[in-house]
Amino acid sequence: MAVRPGPMHGAPLPDTNGDIDPGPLARQATAVREMGSPFVAAVLAAGERQLYRAPRTAALIADWPRDVAADALARAGHDTALSDLYRRLDGDFDSVIGATMHAADAHIAEWMRTPPQTNEVGRTAAIMAALMTLRSRFDMPCELRELGASAGLNLNLDRYAYDLGGHVAGDPASSVRVAPAWHGAAPLIRPIAVASARGVDLSPLDVTDAAACERLMAFIWADEADRAERLAQALRIARAHPPVVDTGDITRWLPTMLAAPQAAGVCRTIVHSMALQYLDASGHAAVERAFAEAGARANADRPLARIGFEWTAARDAVHLCLTIWPDGVTRHLATCHAYGAWIDWHDTGA
């Protein structure tokens, strides 16, 4: 990728008229701005313009859709100018970001070699709504299993409080409150019971490891203090109620888990949120095959459910979908903000 220096202090990148790729950080800046985070968008745009000052980082992210580690450096507090920029959410972006990228090029490149971890607790509102819809079909506890669980914070979803368009659910005394902007029909409010919870991740984060928790916090956008506080509280709950997350590959773990004995009167429920986008075509095929084979074995006493919170194939929307076996019918319950900030509920319960 040809990296070019640009103008200073938040000036836009030149209009390419679609002829030149503006660069991975500029593309991400556009996406982040559209998702409501102008400060992080400005940081990324400045990073694109100043990328020539960090050759190791530039080489690493060429054609690679991951974010840079500026948030982690700001949180660490070692770079006073960067920390000040993040604290004030304004300033000379190009000067500060450029100097930081030049000074911390090796650190940023090394930090980016590990997979991103965004255990977004805000998505649990959509998952909880889907679980309550499922409970209206099968009045039984669920055996909750999560693919790509990260630190396993979503496995504690029954320990959080929810406000779904004025309809409350979950634990009202919880320090974690998830209240997305709700549009559409009211959700079906049902008490859910989690018989057991377990997840899998290629590199699960240990909630008792301060460095791992700090890394997770660094993925929260700097201008979203509410998200950061919610994550901090979810980590506190997780330390009191440690989630069980296996280290493993989804495509190998899922078939084994689905083949395990299932108690009668328990709905085996598989959840995945923004996890399948990291699989290649063969990985997707393996997941679909595992669900199809397990679905063929499901019955009314031992049902199987799949809750997906994923981008569409065109990556133009995030859909919340529920598939229930033995009938195998998939319902598009809602369209959602990628981090759960709003939910447009479509399901009528029919």
Pin down the residues of each PLM region.
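Short catalytic/ligand-binding loop motif for oxyanion handling, primarily in non-cytosolic enzymes
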Residues: 152-156, 278-280, 315-317
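A short, acidic, amphipathic alpha-helical segment used as a generic capping/interface helix at domain edges
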Residues: 249-262, 290-295
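A short SAM/SAH-binding and catalytic strip from SAM-dependent methyltransferases
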Residues: 268-281
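A short N-terminal interaction module
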Residues: 1-106, 110-117, 121-127
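Extended hydrophobic secondary-structure segments that form protein cores and membrane-embedded regions
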Residues: 144-147, 271-272, 305-311
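Class I S-adenosyl-L-methionine-dependent methyltransferase module
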Residues: 79, 91-92, 98, 102, ...
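Short alpha-helical segments and helix-capping/turn motifs at coil-helix boundaries
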Residues: 126-134, 291
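Domain-level detector for long C-terminal conserved domains
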Residues: 219-221, 225-229, 243, 285-287, ...
